[in-house]
Amino acid sequence: MTTAPVSPLQAVVTANHDAISDDPAKAAVVFRAEARAHSAVASTVALGRFEIEVDEPPALGGENTAPPNPPVEYYLASLLSCQVVTYRVWADKLGIAVDGITARAEGDLDVRGFFGFDDAVRAGFGEVRVVVTLTGPESRERYLELQEAVDAHCPVLDLTRNATPVRTVVETP
């Protein structure tokens, strides 16, 4: 008997499905990050065993010491990288062939909200635009079907489209 080859992503999805089916508590995952401030507005952020540097451009009080500069660009990077992962996983799940994925994003931010110059202006992006280019043998309709699945399942996109409760606690010695 010949079995169809299983892609690495299919194997990951299947393993997670099986583990979660056996114990639904395994579906709950906690991600962590920890930041330490230094310089004027720069910080070092620990993500597991990795560290990244975050800074702002001089116009926002920073020293331009780390690419990308503003933390909002890290948000764009997070959104795009999550989109790429989600496109790969869902292309595999739906049996849609994708040869290449490129994505770009830009967001409009009015700094009056950040600096508190105008309380009617939100502090974050007013709009984010994402363009994903897919190459491969499938029809446009199949790729639009894939986009619908990605839009419904991309965790970082979900954070933006749906209000996520954030609880902040200030600790002092």
Residue ranges and their predicted role:
Residues 1-77, 89-173:
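Extended beta-strand/beta-hairpin segments
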Residues 79-83:
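Alpha-helical metal-binding/catalytic segments enriched in His/Glu/Asp
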Residues 84, 88:
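Aromatic- and glycine-enriched beta-alpha-beta binding-site module
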